[in-house]
Amino acid sequence: MATANAEQSIGPPEQAQVIQPPLPATITDLAALLEIPLDDCLVPCNFCGNFLTYLEICEFDEKRLSLIWKEYLVYACCRCCCTATATFEFNEFYESTVTGREIEDVTGKSIFDIDVRCQTCMKYLDAIEKLDICGRRRPFHLVRGSWKGICRLCKHFYNDW
């Protein structure tokens, strides 16, 4: 008799689990969820704490970066901190470099299927930017397991046009 009672769970009844919708990953999605205009969004930078300007909000989504959620508080990354973070990651976590189309041999994937971000501003490179790097035999760098190159805007800083 004692063993039969010991096997039964004694405690509070199971509570129904509340399923919460996923938190938005972009500032545009956040604005839509809150039903406010994009230019009314006040999102602080995760690193410096300054609120992103409207231009930085647009750049953040254009770069295909994701919002950071900490205990239901949202953070993004401003332009200056994006550049600083990209530089830090490159300097601390650099792994290797390939030139132009060699990236396809190393990864075993088509250039169109390889995710590449700008090593300077963290923008997600489009197909034209990746093909430009391949065609001009410029470098792709493997940094922290992700491929980096130079986007069309940042290549002007390097006088590489």
From Swiss-Prot:
<keyword id="KW-1090">Inhibition of host innate immune response by virus</keyword>
<keyword id="KW-0238">DNA-binding</keyword>
<dbReference type="GO" id="GO:0042025">
    <property type="term" value="C:host cell nucleus"/>
</dbReference>
<keyword id="KW-0804">Transcription</keyword>
<protein>
    <recommendedName>
        <fullName>Protein E6</fullName>
    </recommendedName>
</protein>
<keyword id="KW-0244">Early protein</keyword>
<comment type="subunit">
    <text>Forms homodimers. Interacts with ubiquitin-protein ligase UBE3A/E6-AP; this interaction stimulates UBE3A ubiquitin activity. Interacts with host BAK1.</text>
</comment>
<keyword id="KW-1048">Host nucleus</keyword>
<keyword id="KW-0010">Activator</keyword>
<keyword id="KW-0863">Zinc-finger</keyword>
<dbReference type="InterPro" id="IPR001334">
    <property type="entry name" value="E6"/>
</dbReference>
<keyword id="KW-1119">Modulation of host cell apoptosis by virus</keyword>
<dbReference type="Pfam" id="PF00518">
    <property type="entry name" value="E6"/>
</dbReference>
<dbReference type="GO" id="GO:0052170">
    <property type="term" value="P:symbiont-mediated suppression of host innate immune response"/>
</dbReference>
<comment type="function">
    <text>Plays a major role in the induction and maintenance of cellular transformation. E6 associates with host UBE3A/E6-AP ubiquitin-protein ligase and modulates its activity. Protects host keratinocytes from apoptosis by mediating the degradation of host BAK1. May also inhibit host immune response.</text>
</comment>
<dbReference type="GO" id="GO:0030430">
    <property type="term" value="C:host cell cytoplasm"/>
</dbReference>
<dbReference type="GO" id="GO:0006355">
    <property type="term" value="P:regulation of DNA-templated transcription"/>
</dbReference>
<dbReference type="GO" id="GO:0006351">
    <property type="term" value="P:DNA-templated transcription"/>
</dbReference>
<keyword id="KW-0479">Metal-binding</keyword>
<keyword id="KW-0862">Zinc</keyword>
<dbReference type="GO" id="GO:0008270">
    <property type="term" value="F:zinc ion binding"/>
</dbReference>
<dbReference type="GO" id="GO:0039648">
    <property type="term" value="P:symbiont-mediated perturbation of host ubiquitin-like protein modification"/>
</dbReference>
<keyword id="KW-1035">Host cytoplasm</keyword>
<dbReference type="InterPro" id="IPR038575">
    <property type="entry name" value="E6_sf"/>
</dbReference>
<comment type="similarity">
    <text>Belongs to the papillomaviridae E6 protein family.</text>
</comment>
<feature type="zinc finger region">
    <location>
        <begin position="45"/>
        <end position="81"/>
    </location>
</feature>
<dbReference type="GO" id="GO:0039502">
    <property type="term" value="P:symbiont-mediated suppression of host type I interferon-mediated signaling pathway"/>
</dbReference>
<keyword id="KW-0805">Transcription regulation</keyword>
<keyword id="KW-0945">Host-virus interaction</keyword>
<dbReference type="GO" id="GO:0052150">
    <property type="term" value="P:symbiont-mediated perturbation of host apoptosis"/>
</dbReference>
<keyword id="KW-0899">Viral immunoevasion</keyword>
<feature type="zinc finger region">
    <location>
        <begin position="118"/>
        <end position="154"/>
    </location>
</feature>
<dbReference type="GO" id="GO:0003677">
    <property type="term" value="F:DNA binding"/>
</dbReference>
